[in-house]
Regions:
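Residue-level marker of regulatory loop/turn positions in helix-turn-helix DNA-binding domains and
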Residues: 90, 111, 144
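Asp-based, Mg2+/Mn2+-dependent phosphohydrolase catalytic module
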Residues: 95-103, 115-255
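Ser/Thr-glycine-rich phosphate-binding loops at phosphate-binding pockets of nucleotides
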Residues: 2-3, 112, 176
């Protein structure tokens, strides 16, 4: 939803499948609700949604517990590994933006809620398309994933950059924006290409203009409410934000 997989489709599709296997259908909105978290935490948070808990109790005669979450996470891993490459196309504009940032001496760090074995598939597919971040940190590499700041701060260490207030966190999820804020970084929310709208590129492009504007406005409002310093549609539009951040840093401003 940030650099690849327009609409953040890969995990959402698999979460729906996992709950179907457990006999409790969930909606795509329910599958997306905790997006950005470590995937086991994500499954647990879905089981905490009141409507899902009610369906689960109706089906199984009890509420979901830790063993259910463990079992669904065990189902999730192979399903996700099997389909990742189907959703690995880079989001338009990614390569040009990364080239420009690197020409300005900016290092590129990546964070993800995927496990390391899943991330290796994404990194391989991204590299084949010409994109390779300088550092990648998974939720499984640190004590806790989003919205905690640990993945961002591990990237700071890996990249040996300082000060933190000169770093920028770009994300398509609310927990990802919170992650950046908690790390003390500037934040740029991507409202259209990721989880907030949750549509593949072709489906987004096919929407009537009025529907696009309604959905876009809702996503922008949610990201601003989460505290994002800037919100744009996709990665292709974020370079002016960096120009503004540099101006604000020169004035002594901090996130």
């Amino acid at each position: 939803g940030t650099t690849m997989d327009f609409g953040c489709m890969a995990p959402a599709v698999v979460f729906v499948k996992v709950f179907e296997r457990a006999g409790v259908p969930i909606t795509m909105d329910e599958a997306r609700a905790p997006m950005g978290a470590h995937k086991r935490v994500h499954i647990q948070k879905i089981t905490e949604i009141p409507a899902v808990r009610a369906r689960w109790e109706s089906k199984h005669g009890r509420l979901p517990g830790e063993k259910d979450v463990d079992r669904m996470f065990a189902d999730f891993v192979p399903l996700q590994l099997a389909c990742l490459s189907e959703y690995s196309a880079l989001i338009p504009g990614t390569l040009d933006v990364m080239k420009t940032l690197r020409a300005r001496g900016i290092k590129i760090g990546s964070t993800t809620g995927y496990l390391r074995e899943m991330t290796e598939i994404n990194l391989r597919d991204a590299k084949r398309q010409g994109y390779e971040p300088d550092s990648t940190v998974c939720a499984s590499d640190v004590p806790a994933g989003r919205p905690y700041p640990y993945m961002c701060l591990q990237n700071v260490i890996n990249l040996q950059v300082s000060p933190v207030e000169a770093c920028v966190k770009v994300d398509d999820t609310i927990p990802g924006i919170e992650e950046g804020l908690n790390a003390g970084m500037w934040t740029i929310g991507l409202a259209v290409s990721g989880d907030e709208i949750g549509l593949p590129l072709k489906d987004w492009q096919a929407l009537p203009d009025a529907e696009k504007q309604t959905r876009r406005q809702r996503a922008y409002e949610r990201m601003r409410m989460a505290g994002a310093n800037y919100v744009v549609d996709t990665i292709a539009e974020m370079l002016p934000c960096f120009d503004d951040i540099e101006t604000r840093l020169a004035r002594g401003e901090k996130p």
